[in-house]
Amino acid sequence: MKIKLTTVYVDDQEKALHFYTGTMAFQKKADFSNGPFRWLTVVSPEDPNGMELQLALNSNPAAKAWQQALFQQSQPAAMFFTDNLQADYEGMKARGAEFTMPPTDVTASKIAMLKDTCGNLIQVTELKRW
């Protein structure tokens, strides 16, 4: 058994696709509709057959409330890892990302936080090498 998918709820799937493929530089993996429902996932270009991130519309009131509560409490909806936070920070900033926290040293890592334009905060983490 393995983990293959996680979900981020978004207020606009097209806007989310633009952000996650443009600003974050991920790749679209799946995009198909079934009636009013759209299944949309992105993956890291470094691991195109690995973990998928579903960009799900927050049309369910519980999903919307959860998304808003996380954002209001400055909690990330998702966390991504990198080997070079400073380079990724500069690249995303150049592509228009709005960071709420620049790269910051914490106990075992460096982290940065940005808005995904769709109602979420995203944390990008570089683990420190000991």
Spell out what each predicted region is:
Residues 1-5, 27-81, 89-115, 126-130:
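Vicinal oxygen chelate
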Residues 84:
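Conserved catalytic-loop position in the HRD/HxD motif
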Residues 10-13:
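Conserved beta-strand-loop-alpha-helix junction that forms the acyl-donor binding cleft
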Residues 16-21, 92, 119:
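Conserved active-site tyrosine of GNAT-family acetyltransferases
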